[in-house]
Amino acid sequence: AERDPDKLVDIIAALEPTLGGVNLEDIKAPECFTIERRLRERMKIPVFHDDQHGTAIISAAAVINGLELVGKQIGAIKLAVSGAGAAAIACLDLLVALGVKRENIFVCDSRGVIHDRREDRLDESKKRYQQKTPARTLADVMVNADVVLGCSAAGAITQDMVKVMAPRPIILALANPEPEIRPELAKAVRPDCIIATGRSDYPNQVNNV
């Protein structure tokens, strides 16, 4: 497997005459953003990163339908996010385009909330979602959240976090193979929640295309 982004771009671009489109898979952030952008600039065929855009499309559909079921408007929701990799950022970009207000989005990576006083170096994709907020943890930002999007790791969302969400919360726990919180645990403390995971053995599977 090629690990040099420049070489990977050259290899894929050289295949253009024999392809109708390119589907990128399993390329980590932030390299995936650069590779996709450069390929789109060089190639005249569609370039699609499934881990980003496939997940974003299906997740956005889940949010739209979930909000309709619980009677909430997309422009009024508070969104908490666990994870800030390629899939999470693509989901957020699409949700913003669909009407979620950027000031109502609170993103957590492995170091906590992406806030305006962070001293570590953030890549451009994360900087778009920096917030001026005293919140520092996922538990903090999940208070009164209408939707939580999990694109992180098993167990990242606890029952205590779910308890303090807004009425009729929507939980997208998309980590695979083990979700951020299992549906039975979420339902035990919030029977009013709608929860989707990336697994086919639970109801409401939300996965990439």
Provide a role label for each language-model segment.
Residues 35-42, 135, 142-144, 152-171:
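Rossmann-fold NAD(P) dinucleotide-binding segment
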Residues 155-209:
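Rossmann-fold NAD(P)-binding glycine/threonine-rich loop
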Residues 1-77:
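Glycine/serine-rich phosphate-binding loop and adjoining beta1-alpha1 elements at the start
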Residues 23-26, 47-50, 81, 107, ...:
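General beta-strand structural signal in soluble alpha/beta enzymes
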Residues 1, 26-29, 50-53, 110-112, ...:
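Short, ordered loop/turn segments at secondary-structure junctions
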Residues 30-32, 55-56, 88-89, 113-116, ...:
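Flexible loop/turn segments at secondary-structure boundaries
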Residues 14-16, 40-41, 70-74, 98-99, ...:
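Solvent-exposed alpha-helices and their adjacent loops that cap or buttress functional pockets
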Residues 57-149:
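Glycine-rich phosphate/diphosphate-binding loop of Rossmann-like nucleotide-binding domains
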